[in-house]
Amino acid sequence: DYWWWSDGLYMVMPVMTKLYKVTGNHLYLDKLYEYIVYSDSIMLDRETGLYYRDAKYVYPKHKTSSGKKDFWARGDGWVLAGLAKVLKDLPADYEHRSFFVNKYVKLAEAVAAIQQPEGYWTRSMMDPTHAPGPETSGTAFFTYGFLWGINNGYLDEAVYKPVIDKAWNYLAKTALQKNGKIGYVQPIGEKAIPGQVVDADSEANFGVGAFLLAACEYVRYLEAPENQDRAYWCNLLYKMAAPVLSNMAEGNLKKNMLVEVSPNWDGRNKGVTYMETFGRLMAGVAPWLTLPDDDTEEGQMRK
């Protein structure tokens, strides 16, 4: 009966997979599976794939003010982020790995489907009127979870990137304040509370942590080779290098590549200097130029 609330899944699941990695003791993986099965039995809504915060909030015993199922955003954020961290460390041949993969994917699908048009998720995710307005901690955890899934090949970028774009727009332009603080974070709690004020001044350390978690994963996404606009940068390199190289080849460097400088440039009284000022530029271009020629447009540029 250890894992009876959603926060606990984030707190303990990743620790168990880390302990397995450190010790090699398979007991940690056995108990990981045993305990999550227990958690599912008391707080997983199998119809939606979402988690209730704990057994007190299971429908129909508990309902929102509109009579709907009440799924707490930060609670499901803990779970999605926790599953991402677990998958990172689970061995490829673990007998229950597909169980965790399917759980993660289904939860991601369920969460993405109920995003608000403004990019955030409300505190009660399936009933925006119950406690209306944005909530940052849950939104940030979801954003991290989606980005991790794309970065590691579990989620379809074409499906989830639009969701991430809207969520990050909210996080970067609304949640992040001009003074660097992270607002719209629901205080410590366990449910969406009608009438509770959550505004730009509402801050909490777990909101900041979730924001940073999402931001770091977004940087990893942006730094992935397939997301770099190689064609743009290669074209820019070509435009910088071509005039220099063509004049060098024709022996016209000093004639055609004069550069005006300050009279006291480098301590020397010169009106012009030759290619000295292009040295660093060309040093930066050189690694690209040394790549082999090929039949691509980029290869022909180098040729």
Model feature map: region roles:
Residues D1, H26-Y52, V101-G119, V163-K181, ...:
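Long, well-ordered core segments of solenoidal/helical folds
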Residues D1-W3, D7, G49-W72, E118-T139, ...:
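Carbohydrate-binding/catalytic loop surfaces
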Residues W5-K21, W72-K88, E135-N151, E203-V219, ...:
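Well-ordered alpha-helical segments within folded domains of soluble proteins
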Residues L19-Y33, L87-K106, A112, G149-K166, ...:
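Structural helix-adjacent loops and short alpha-helical linkers that scaffold large soluble proteins
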Residues L32-M126:
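Active-site cradle of extracellular carbohydrate-active enzymes
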Residues G133-P225, S246-P263:
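CBM-like carbohydrate-recognition segments
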Residues N227-E260, D266-F278:
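N-terminal basic, low-complexity leaders that serve as flexible interaction/assembly modules and, when applicable
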Residues W265-K303:
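Membrane helical hairpin/interfacial module
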